[in-house]
């Protein structure tokens, strides 16, 4: 099965040893994506920035939002759940992937959200 690594712009990628996304066959895994450079924005705005980065990685892997079957949202503050959830719903409200939202300490203390995504591209 063919493997394609999709590089992002994070300086952490070579240090930690990860790719923004990896496509194996028709499955695309997008790494945890944070709002780098958007730390001062609201939780909803950070979520929109993150989803834009995820969309770019999906496109580079030959996928679209419509192919996403699962997302995982890691949020820094429980009180942000609805704001983040609504921004997630702006993209996925009709698509309705399986989703998880967990409160967690994030790598950057100013990040309010980090999101992972998995997509399956139709043959």
What name fits each language-model region?
Residues 1-69, 75-123:
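N-terminal presequence-like segments and the immediate start of the first folded domain
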